[in-house]
């Protein structure tokens, strides 16, 4: 089964917790802190595997959670970094953040990789908090939470040339006669329901990959029929071969077909109109084809070059292939996405940390709820089993301006304050 779009959940591993420990060595009084740092959590890394052709595997496994880092140990020993979780994807996979719509990666070549969810850093052990005024601190951090997000995977086939047109205009037949591909061919619409790829040899030491894309109908750009499912595969092609049925057996006007398909391409993605398009008048072996072709030429004008062919008899096919090969030699790759720079993704939730660091709301029972990436991250990294860590967290809240903001919202001694699922009393 061909699957070209799927939604999955990914989570980087949490960092390991730092440790509170002290040196216990004979004849060394007050040996000092010796708690090690936690190890970094594993990243979730997507890697291109050229043998894969579909996203089918992701229908059965939709959650990918990387391992956390090892906790810090005594004697100043740091925890081990967790091994990255490798997720293999087929060439042509685009990874998109489901919440923001941001393109995280466009994975094309074998072995290409991208970090999709970063692991959290390890928490610091108590040796990191030693100061002249506090030489033996009882403070250690929990590991930083790993990045988590829902992502959309879209597979856009890798082909140099895309065959487009209405259903049953002869796209699959054309692909079958110019390559070794064997797409399903039958006398009914939408026989082709998945893209078929074939390698075309022109006979003069040139070759290219051609994709037979399922037929389009009016409204495809808005999802009519299987519109979006098909149109996304055209985006990677460099040359579009527009196949038109000149026989008239379907009862449609060839010129109206031509206008409709071009409009669908334009409405779906305006950049598709930048690609060179070769217009193919197919089924020229049929009785009324020549008459229909002349009428078509009068309507499109002399600017549009038309290649009359018969995919069944192979009439005109050789000239068509040479024209396509010539166009490919002068047509560059078209970038289909603006992929986020590495600098944009190297800091977790960078967009959320810019601007307001926290938000305060009040529930119907009077409870103050504090939310925001910075405060929630600080909360998760605090070890509340140790008094010094609790006092440090209180100082951090004051430093962020949360105490002052709560007073401004009317908070008084004894009022309940909630962060995530935890509640505590406000002390003024």
Swiss-Prot record:
E.C. designation(s): 3.6.5.-
One GO CC term, this protein: cytoplasm
Location in or out of the cell: Cytoplasm
Region feature Disordered, mapped onto this chain: 117-145
GO BP annotations, alphabetical order: ribosome biogenesis
Pfam families listed in its UniProt record: DUF1967, GTP1_OBG, MMR_HSR1
Domain OCT: 350-428
Keywords in alphabetical order: Cytoplasm, GTP-binding, Hydrolase, Magnesium, Metal-binding, Nucleotide-binding
Binding site for Mg(2+): 172, 192
Residue ranges constituting the Obg domain according to the UniProt record: 1-158
Family according to the record: Belongs to the TRAFAC class OBG-HflX-like GTPase superfamily. OBG GTPase family.
NCBIfam families recorded: Obg_CgtA (TIGR02729), Obg_CgtA_exten (TIGR03595), PRK12296.1 (NF008954), PRK12297.1 (NF008955), PRK12299.1 (NF008956), small_GTP (TIGR00231)
This protein's name: GTPase Obg
Gene that this sequence comes from: obg
């Amino acid at each position: 089964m061909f699957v070209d779009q799927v939604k999955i959940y990914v989570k980087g591993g949490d960092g390991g917790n730092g440790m509170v420990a002290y040196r216990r060595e004979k004849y060394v009084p007050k040996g000092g802190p010796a708690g090690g740092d936690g190890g970094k959590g594993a990243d979730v890394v997507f890697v291109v595997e050229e043998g894969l052709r579909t996203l089918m595997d992701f229908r059965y496994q939709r959650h990918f959670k990387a391992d956390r880092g090892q906790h810090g140990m005594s004697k100043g020993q740091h925890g081990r970094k967790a091994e990255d979780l490798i997720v293999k994807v087929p060439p042509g996979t685009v990874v998109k953040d489901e919440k923001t719509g941001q393109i995280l990666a466009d994975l094309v070549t074998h072995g290409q990789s991208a970090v999709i969810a970063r692991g959290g850093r390890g928490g610091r052990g108590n040796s990191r908090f030693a100061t002249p005024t506090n030489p033996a601190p009882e403070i250690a951090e929990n590991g930083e939470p790993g990045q988590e997000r829902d992502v959309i995977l879209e597979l856009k086939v890798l082909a140099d040339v895309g065959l487009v047109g209405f259903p049953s205009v002869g796209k699959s037949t054309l692909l079958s006669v110019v390559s070794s591909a064997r797409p399903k061919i039958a006398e009914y619409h939408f026989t082709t329901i998945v893209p078929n790829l074939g390698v075309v040899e022109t006979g003069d030491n040139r070759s290219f990959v051609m994709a037979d894309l399922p037929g389009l109908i009016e409204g495809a750009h808005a999802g009519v029929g299987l519109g979006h499912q098909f149109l996304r595969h055209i985006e990677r092609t460099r040359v579009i071969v527009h196949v038109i049925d000149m026989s008239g057996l379907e009862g449609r006007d060839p010129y109206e077909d031509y206008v409709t398909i071009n409009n669908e391409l334009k409405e779906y993605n305006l950049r598709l109109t930048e690609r060179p398009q070769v217009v193919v008048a197919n089924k020229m072996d049929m009785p009324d084809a020549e008459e229909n072709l002349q009428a078509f030429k009068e309507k499109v004008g002399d600017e549009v070059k038309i290649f009359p062919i018969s995919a069944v008899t192979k009439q005109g096919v050789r000239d068509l292939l040479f024209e396509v090969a010539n166009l490919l030699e002068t047509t560059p790759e078209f970038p289909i996405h603006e992929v986020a720079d590495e600098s944009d993704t190297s800091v977790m939730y960078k967009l959320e940390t810019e601007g307001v660091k926290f938000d305060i709301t009040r529930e119907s029972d009077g409870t103050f709820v504090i939310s925001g990436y910075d405060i929630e991250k600080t909360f998760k990294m605090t070890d509340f089993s140790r008094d010094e860590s609790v006092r440090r967290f209180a100082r951090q809240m004051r430093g962020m301006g949360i105490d002052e903001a709560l007073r401004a919202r009317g908070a008084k001694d004894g009022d309940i304050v909630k962060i995530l699922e935890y509640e505590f009393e406000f002390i003024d």
